[in-house]
């Protein structure tokens, strides 16, 4: 749940920016950002009672960043509660 809390913290400050949170060897994103990942990469969405989540292996991050940049979608990557744009 810490990943989701980190996501919400950064998303509240950056409404129009996708937020990815590193969790172990995966990156996760939540809620409406999941729909973008579904459209671009066909990643499955897991629906929970209060939120939705999708994730991908950390070794795919360069592919994801390249596609988001190509589509002119802003994003933030959060690792260890430190973010990079």
Where are these regions (language model features)?
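Basic, polar low-complexity surface loops/patches
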Residues: 1-85
